[in-house]
Amino acid sequence: MKQSYDRLLLFIVLLLILVGLTAVYSSTSVISPDLLEKYHKKGVMLSQFGFIRKQLLTMGLGLIAMFMAFKIPLGLIRKMSIPLLVISLVCLLMVFTKFGITAGGARRWIRIWPSTFQPSELVKLCMVLFLSFYMSMTRYRTEKFTSFLVPILIMGAFQVVFLKQPDFGAAMSLGLLTISMLFLSGIRLRYIFSLGILVIPVVIKLISEPYRWKRVATFLDPWKDPLGSGFQLVQSFIALGSGGLTGVGLGEGKQKLFFLPEVHTDFIFSMIGEELGFIGAALVALLFFTFFLKGISIARKAADPFHYYLAYGLSIMIAIQAIFNFAVVTGMLPTKGLPLPFISYGGSSLITSMTAVGLLLNVSRNYRQGAEAERDELSARRQSFSPNTETGPSRSRSRTGSHSLPQSGRYQWQRGYWYTRENRRTSGTRRLIGLRGGPRR
């Protein structure tokens, strides 16, 4: 059978990567000595055009990772979900060893010559794999508290390591990702609300740290100290405002000229808004929204519970990072240091995101193969029970002109629709899937 996959999803991702390469090249066309020194401290020796060359190399590695994720059987990935989660935890703990790199007062990277790697990106991907496996195994016991407790304890262990680095942004995104997937599995809402009440004192304690409270104060009023703590956010506002409707022109932005810090990573969306205007920024946001809708569509058509949760989790993972980045750049959230998937400069985020896309395409290939097989079976049944057939089981004609199939069969034809033995309507090319609780059987 010819393999098929969701080509529109692949086209959207490749378009986002192309936008990212263009934005990285534009934002790094003029590099400040301070930025080069920052990367030299990480052990990464880059020149003016070294950023775009490294991003192109990373894109090549990401394409290889995406192809491998597309080809590996999902059954094998399911079996490897727990070992992969353990490997991600080991990588996360390595930041506290001699392989770890300190930058900006945080230990979030490990040295992999000749570059660096951020384990938090791998953790989020492996957490989606584990939760998909776990919830597909416990989908009939979602009302039990133990089904909720196990993933929460595992998430809590990773949260402790994140806060020790510290990386509050990764901790928040992982927490929101886990809760979202548990909600989809049908976990009782009172468990989630109880967890939220218990977490409130912890969040207050974390925010009360002097440097975090300073970020919150800057978020509330960045113009109070526009040349100090609010400098980055104010410059982001200036970049977005300068772009207007159509932008100042590709490569003509001024904020990248040593005004806006981290313009090639966390605040690259500000530069897109400046050079391409509101229209360009809105189109980028629309691409992410379409990506999310396609991911949800793939999940809703999945026939296997593991595939269902995997597609939902990967779509939510990408969406959370994109929404957080948009919110930080526009001043709706305090600065957190989360890159924009597929677009921001950085190897860890790009490779992880492209691996997630490969898994999504893998799920879409599996449900399309299943749909083709089911359609062939239905076609054969229609021919077997057609009115022109001279031999075969007895048939009765209804007022609507449809034909009845034997009650022992897998499908029943009634009033112009095929029904499964559970008496659920099916079109022959897809299965009905609910928003919560996974695929209906």
PLM feature segments, named:
Residues 1-2:
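Short, Lys/Arg-rich, polar N-terminal cytosolic tail immediately upstream
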Residues 12-18, 26, 37-232, 270-328, ...:
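Hydrophobic alpha-helical transmembrane segments of multi-pass inner membrane proteins, especially
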Residues 13, 18, 331-369, 373:
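Transmembrane alpha-helices of multi-pass inner-membrane enzymes
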Residues 30-31:
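Transmembrane helices with small-residue packing motifs
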Residues 106-114, 230, 266, 333-341, ...:
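Active-site-proximal inter-transmembrane loops
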Residues 113-123, 164-166, 244-249, 338-350:
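Glycine/serine-rich anion-binding loops at beta->alpha junctions
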Residues 167-172, 247-253, 263-265, 278, ...:
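Transmembrane helix boundary and interhelical junction motifs in multipass membrane proteins
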Residues 222-265, 279-280:
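TM-adjacent membrane-interface loops and short helices in multi-pass inner/ER membrane proteins
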